Regions:
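Short, Lys/Arg-rich, polar N-terminal cytosolic tail immediately upstream
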Residues: 1-15
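A structural signal for multi-pass alpha-helical bundles of membrane permease subunits
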Residues: 19-303
């Protein structure tokens, strides 16, 4: 009998109770997290006339893509009501385009401005540096709703209501978390490369653009993803500053769709179909940049 056969016959040690409890807790958290998401998808796939009859079912009784066709404009309001819909309508394509433009502008401007400010706080010396950085940190402690009224007054005086500029402006210049996060990364970079570039006659802007930024892809991707998800889901500010149909983003369009009740109640299957479509760009962004975020967290933990 070989040692391999002996090892194969030895019984495996049972998992400790702590491990079982940890797995049970993870399973419960996973169910709490994914349960509502599955109900959204299940309702989106349910036939409008079968929703109330099979509300307690975990699987759609009559799976169909009809609700997605209705949301995307492939079915008229009359035909929608004929199959059990409420007749509510939404210009999903226009709202999707507005959301994509709004999110792209916020990500580019916020990430770029935050990176430049973070590098200035990390490497440059100028009067009032500590006071300004303390103000940036203090901005993270203020609830966003506190700034809505002054921002709205400013946007109104500039004539930017119902415009993309009015929606983007409050998010474009500063993000306290992004500046703090990137500053901490820039401080961890060795100065040798920057000093070598400085000896070669490079300006601070050239060093930042050609030396620092290529080394900062992972934290920049993290900031871009977090700011992109926040901008994609932003509702309150676009709702108060740009409620017009031509400038509505997806969260505002979904609220408008829900508030339409030609048949006396919201169109839940259509609303869930629209919500499912709204989730897809966020999931795509997570699939593309998720690995970068994990690398950034691992790097921060290692430091």
């Amino acid at each position: 009998m070989t040692s391999t056969d002996t090892a194969a016959r030895l019984p495996r040690a049972p998992l400790p109770w702590g491990r079982w409890l940890a797995w049970a807790a993870l399973g419960a958290m996973l169910a709490i997290t994914l349960g509502p998401l599955w109900l959204v998808v299940k309702t989106a796939l349910e036939h409008p006339q079968a929703l109330l009859a099979h509300a307690a079912s975990l699987l759609p009784a009559e799976p169909t893509l009809l609700n997605f066709r209705r949301v995307l404009g492939g079915v008229s309001a009359e035909a929608s009501m004929a199959v059990g819909g409420s007749g509510a309508e939404v210009n999903f394509a226009r709202a999707l385009g507005n959301s994509l433009l709004f999110t792209t502008l916020v990500v580019l401007l916020q990430t770029g401005n935050s990176a430049m400010a973070a590098y200035a706080f990390a490497r440059l010396q100028f009067p009032g540096k500590r006071v300004l950085f303390a103000a940036v940190l203090g901005s993270m402690m203020l609830p966003g709703v506190v700034l809505f009224i002054p921002n709205f007054i400013l946007i109104k005086q500039l004539g930017w209501l119902n415009s993309m500029a009015g929606m983007v402006a409050p998010f474009a210049l500063i993000s306290g978390f992004s500046i703090f996060f990137l500053r901490q990364f820039f401080l961890s970079l060795p100065r040798d490369l920057e000093e070598a570039a400085l000896l070669d006659g490079a300006t601070p802007w050239c060093i930042f653009r050609r030396v620092v930024l290529p080394l900062s892809v992972t934290p920049l991707a993290t900031v871009a993803m977090l700011s992109g998800i926040a901008a994609w889901n932003e509702f309150f500010w676009p709702f108060i500053v740009a409620p017009g149909e031509d400038s509505q983003v997806l969260p505002v369009a979904l609220q408008h769709f829900k508030s339409q009740t030609p048949q006396g109640q919201p169109d839940w299957t259509g609303l869930m179909a629209a919500a499912t479509l709204t989730l897809l760009p966020t999931l795509a962004l997570l699939a593309v940049l998720g690995r970068r975020v994990v690398e950034s967290v691992q790097y921060s933990g290692g430091k």
